[in-house]
């Protein structure tokens, strides 16, 4: 039976251990604490804040935390008190087995200072384990011939505690044949042996039952028992004997299972069945049992499972040889496991500061790394480095810790994410290495303005565009990210023709697309200069500018405008004269037209669209000059009607037409006489023409009288000014604006001409009365006569009265005629070239406007030389009322003047008219019948 054990109070022991745990010392930069095992979670270990000189409230601010190497956290920091406390139950036997001292090393990291402090904590053992036998029942066989003093080894109890808490003593239950002897080995182990005190007699007692008790020395004392059954055997007086008391073996940890270590042999001098020996392990713990295998018949020992130096480097076991007579022999086996480089280094990222700003200073800490290799010696020595092409480097910290820092400034626009490879290699043979990837994100700052691909842009838009039409798209690129790369577009405000630029153009602030807010007119706006700004959304925002030139392209949207001949306001057509003696190529008149478009759209060509006598006249393709194509014949009609078309070269082409009436005669009186006496020879009802003329004259007379009455009232109001105008060629004063037409800020006075037409009742004669040397330039056409239209005349009542008072009539003014040098055109005295070239300089395009200004100026001062100036258009005074000048815009960039490239002058020439040859008084001219 087990002896009674005293159990002192456990609380006193725990209190003693807790007091010992508060003691610490600082030596070689390390802090030491101690704490009893099996304490509750949160038990106090030491005051970290005090030992580190930090305020407990600033622990979180300094980033103080515990870092360990892949082990379950046994300790924790109390953030309120700054104390190191247990994180859970600590079992010393699980951590350190039966090591005399159980030391746990942890590290305290102060992040803001970049420092590590080593902490060594000793786990103090308490008596929390009972001594334990591997078996509960033990059978011992003893030969009856055994002599007193014979010793029989008994199983040892195992107590995981250490020191006084470990196994201290054995006790054997009282009996008459056996006693207990305890032997202490070199390593301090206590080995119980059963000693035979008296000779056995199987016949008296064949079996004996004993109880062995194992006790420790802790407080309270703990113990356990094993029942021993002793069987007395028949005579077998020799036990197996091993040749060596101790066997030593070295083995590499990477040896495969099945590898033979050695073979042990025990000899038994007995013969027969008493000499047969069986082998088995004795004194082997549970962890060693599955690692090795012993053949009980041969004594061969082999590896049953792979060994690991890092788990255990030394094994000690006892081998027992037993014969059939229960005689035993024992020996020890010591196995040393040698390390091989079979473990790669481990890299643990304890802290990673990501993302990092791209403008961080060199030397900024990016991460803390912990490196460990489970091998020993050189196999466990590790070196770390990064790739040379990255802007980072590793710096050695304390123990096996490294700091990853920057070597230079970073640029997110070049690299936004760094995949940092940390390579750790040991010094073994062959060396083993490990690569660890660290993904570091670089945070963006607004350090790049938006940029355009080009310094300037040019865009084109057709005129007459739709409002809101897309013109051009601008795109600026900002290499920054997120809001620093969000680009908005705007157009710098300016004015164009007095209006804000924003009323013409708008831009989408998000897409950079330009839109037209108005329909552009090429004739008004040729181009726009814009300044577009691209700004990002960073803080502060950055921006850049780019210039954009927007050109308006011309479209053929303006038809040619005919400047000469102009249509009279009374609805009749203008009359042109061609003498019967005209040779082929004689210049009859010239059609002048302009086009407000430009380029090809303003190139004009002339053609004869319709003629009453085909082949008689021709029109210059580029000059617009109407010339005779052949000599005039007597059979040619007196009045020729021509329709001239003017067409530009746009797409599609636009055109305009003008109708010309050409009278084949040498003078206007002849024209009037022959018009009055003209009678178609093919008409069988020739006698009815007189009736038609009488009716027409009566109608015209009624209209004429009404017109004279109205005109008389108007003329009486302006008689004085008109009188001054005729008597003087000086400065015009007080002339109403209705008598002027503006051409480039010049007003030309419109002279009023009058004539009186007197027709007799007969069919072929008429009398013309010219009360003053001025003639109306508008005659009715033959077609109008045939349609019984009234002959329209313009009568100046005041002039007529003035001439009548003087009792005389001036001779006809010869200025109404055309000389060859006075024909319409740029060079009336020369034949035009139908294949003239297009204008190739700005001076040619300004010719028409200069000629119009010169003509208008002469008409204004009363000394018009429209027909007499060399180098002018050759417009005689007879074209004054018909070619009424309107305001002509400045088309110098797009007007083509057909014909000559000669230099224009505005010199005032003298009139070519001769002095009147007739005497005073009225001159009558009777017309002669045309004979065919």
UniProtKB/Swiss-Prot annotation:
SUPFAM superfamilies in alphabetical order: Cadherin-like
Recorded topology in the membrane: Single-pass type I membrane protein
SMART domains xref list: CA (SM00112)
Cytoplasmic face residues: 714-932
Name recorded for this polypeptide: Protocadherin gamma-A8
GO MF annotations in UniProt: calcium ion binding
Residue ranges that the UniProt entry lists as topological domain Extracellular: 30-692
One Pfam match: Cadherin_tail
Glycosylation sites: 47, 414, 419, 545, 685
Gene3D superfamilies referenced in this protein's UniProt entry, alphabetically: Cadherins
Gene that this polypeptide is encoded by: PCDHGA8
Origin: domain of life: Eukaryota
GO terms for cellular component: plasma membrane
Main localisation: membrane
Region ranges (Disordered): 804-841, 902-932
Cysteines paired by S-S bonds: none
Keywords, ordered alphabetically: Calcium, Cell adhesion, Cell membrane, Glycoprotein, Membrane, Repeat, Signal, Transmembrane, Transmembrane helix
Transmembrane domains' residue ranges: 693-713
Localisation: Cell membrane
Role, per record: Potential calcium-dependent cell-adhesion protein. May be involved in the establishment and maintenance of specific neuronal connections in the brain.
